[in-house]
């Protein structure tokens, strides 16, 4: 396939009339964005990429509209590389690791409530400034609003046949070995550890690498992380970078700049594109890969983008060839589904360090394999699941949507933790542990009734018998309509329910 390497640069001042652009840009060498010539049987997927979103969805979509008007086409997908800030209402703000005086509702709540709808399919990963209580309802990802999809702690999905892998959060040495155990109500430290990446997620992503005898392919088309891969400045103009950000050089030399495990992920999975954010500067790099003889896989084109404010380079346009019959929609990646099934034994809601199969060392071996890449037989099992298209109609409000941002709306307690129907449906369909359920079962404290189940929500027919609802009888603190129950009978019933819940939690801890 012949290619022409070009730069598709997005003006960063918000004005797309060059005559009006008064900002002088001091730029790093630009990334080589591959604009492939369209051959027979191919078309282009037009993708917009932004760095940190910071809840500025109105501004981001408005900028995209200006670009579309200038270029004369419509974007098929928007990718956001973290700090998305999916804040549903003021109750989500205490779940963000941001000093209270800097917390702001921003504009996502309008898309959650239905006041607005995202004009383009939007895909995002989490960063270190997120509404963590909401996102931990969706460990494996899901819709946070119509047309806006969160990738979960780690994921690989497909868009128009392109394989997109993502890792949410940032690196912290003290938390990387732990399980995902955090949920509201967050302890003071847990509101930070909730967004720290875990070894178990990176281990799962490494299973996406090609077969051992495959030295030439690029198994992943696009890989996303909020953090930079540790060592990435060495593959770009580091002198320019350290001149612009003088504190970066010392961190880079000491190994503290970025996630030290992500470069291995690049070498294992050889993504064609690697997109990141977090450090609020646009920076490009090119990572070559070893091949076989004179042949090599395509290099990984790394690009990190800035935050969405005037004068900063926060958006980039990509055009990537896809099959002519490719549908511009999301679908589950069959290999990733098999990896989730293979590694299901690593899922727990207990606060514990997870010993990975490839890092067993001297501890007794509890795994019967170290390589969890799916076998042909395991992939065959996935085909039995049928259509892998991600349904677009499964979103439901768990926290109450904010219809109007009034002073009264600000006076609310922190959001509860909710059982999310998307997590329940996905895990039941795939046959894996439901971390959202396990986190709910850890404690009945701060577990709320999802808004869509409320009788006055207008989103569902209220059922007085909650056993008929998908989640069963033990998931929520609810009034089951026992009417004018005698005090002694009520006391006896509550004691029995308390015993049942305690026993159920103890049973889960043994899994």
UniProtKB/Swiss-Prot annotation:
One GO biological process term: RNA splicing, via transesterification reactions
Keyword annotations: Hydrolase, Iron, Manganese, Metal-binding, mRNA processing, Nucleus, Zinc
UniProt cross-references to InterPro entries, sorted A to Z: Calcineurin-like_PHP_ApaH, DBR1_C, Dbr1_N, Metallo-depent_PP-like
Main location: nucleus
Annotated spans, Disordered: 473-511
Region (Lariat recognition loop): 168-198
Binding site for a divalent metal cation 2: 83, 128, 226, 278
GO CC terms, sorted: nucleus
Pfam families linked to this entry: DBR1 (PF05011), Metallophos (PF00149)
Any one Gene Ontology molecular-function term assigned to this protein's record: RNA lariat debranching enzyme activity
Enzyme Commission numbers on file: 3.1.4.-
Start-end of Basic and acidic residues biased regions: 477-498
Keyword presence, Manganese: yes
Residues at which a divalent metal cation 1 binds: 52, 54, 280
Activity regulation, short description: Active in presence of diverse metals including Fe(2+), Zn(2+), Mn(2+). Binds two metal cations in two adjacent alpha and beta metal-binding pockets.
Co-factor: note: Binds 2 divalent metal cations per subunit.
Cofactors demanded by this protein: Fe(2+); Zn(2+); Mn(2+)
Subcellular location(s) per record: Nucleus
PANTHER family (UniProt xref): LARIAT DEBRANCHING ENZYME, RNA LARIAT DEBRANCHING ENZYME
Reported function: Cleaves the 2'-5' phosphodiester linkage at the branch point of lariat intron pre-mRNAs after splicing and converts them into linear molecules that are subsequently degraded. It thereby facilitates ribonucleotide turnover.
The family this protein is said to belong to: Belongs to the lariat debranching enzyme family.
Protein name stated in the entry: Lariat debranching enzyme
Organism: Caenorhabditis briggsae
Encoding gene (name): dbr-1
């Amino acid at each position: 396939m012949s290619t022409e390497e070009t730069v598709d640069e997005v003006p960063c001042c918000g004005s797309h009339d060059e005559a009006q652009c008064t900002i002088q840009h001091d730029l790093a060498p630009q990334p080589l964005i591959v604009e492939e010539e369209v051959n027979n049987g191919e078309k282009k997927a037009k993708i917009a990429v932004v760095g940190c979103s910071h809840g500025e969805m109105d501004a981001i979509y408005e900028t995209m509209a200006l670009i579309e008007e200038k270029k004369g086409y419509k974007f098929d997908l928007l990718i956001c590389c973290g700090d998305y800030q999916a804040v549903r209402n003021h109750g989500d703000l205490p779940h963000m690791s941001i000093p209270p005086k800097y917390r702001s509702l921003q504009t996502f709540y309008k898309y959650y409530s239905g006041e607005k709808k995202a004009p383009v399919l939007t895909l995002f990963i989490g960063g270190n400034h997120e509404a963590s209580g909401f996102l931990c309802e969706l460990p494996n990802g899901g819709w946070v609003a119509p047309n806006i999809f969160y990738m979960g702690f780690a994921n690989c999905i497909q868009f128009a046949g392109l394989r997109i892998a993502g890792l949410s959060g940032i690196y912290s040495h003290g938390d990387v070995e732990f399980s995902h155990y955090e949920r509201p109500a967050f302890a003071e430290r847990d509101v930070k550890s909730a967004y720290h990446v875990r070894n178990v997620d990176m281990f799962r992503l490494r299973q996406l690498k090609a077969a051992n005898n495959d030295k030439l392919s690029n198994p992943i088309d696009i890989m996303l992380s909020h953090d930079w891969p540790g060592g990435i400045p060495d593959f770009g103009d580091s002198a320019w970078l350290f001149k612009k950000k003088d504190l970066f050089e010392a961190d880079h030399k000491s190994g503290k700049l970025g996630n030290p495990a992500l470069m291995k992920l690049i070498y294992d999975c050889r993504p064609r594109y690697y997109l990141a954010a977090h450090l609020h500067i646009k920076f490009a790099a090119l990572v070559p890969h070893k091949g076989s003889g004179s042949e090599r896989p395509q290099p990984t084109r790394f690009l990190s983008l800035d935050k969405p404010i005037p004068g900063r380079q926060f958006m980039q346009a990509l055009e990537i060839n896809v099959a002519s019959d490719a549908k511009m929609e999301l679908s589950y990646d069959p290999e990733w589904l098999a990896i989730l099934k293979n590694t299901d034994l690593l899922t727990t809601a207990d606060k514990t360090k997870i010993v990975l199969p490839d890092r067993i060392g001297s501890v007794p071996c509890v795994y019967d394999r170290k390589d969890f890449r799916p076998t042909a037989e395991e992939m065959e099992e996935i085909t039995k699941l049928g259509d892998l298209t991600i349904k677009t109609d499964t979103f439901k409000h768990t926290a109450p949507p904010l219809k109007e941002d009034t002073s009264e709306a600000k006076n609310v307690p922190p959001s509860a933790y909710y059982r999310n129907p998307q997590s329940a449906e996905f895990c039941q369909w795939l046959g894996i542990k439901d971390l959202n359920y396990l986190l709910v079962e850890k404690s009945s404290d701060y577990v709320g009734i999802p808004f869509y189940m409320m009788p006055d929500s207008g989103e569902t027919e209220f059922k007085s018998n909650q056993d008929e609802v998908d989640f069963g009888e033990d998931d929520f603190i609810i009034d089951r309509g026992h009417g004018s129950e005698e005090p002694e009978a009520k006391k006896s019933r509550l004691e029995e329910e308390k015993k049942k819940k305690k026993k159920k939690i103890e049973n889960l801890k043994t899994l």
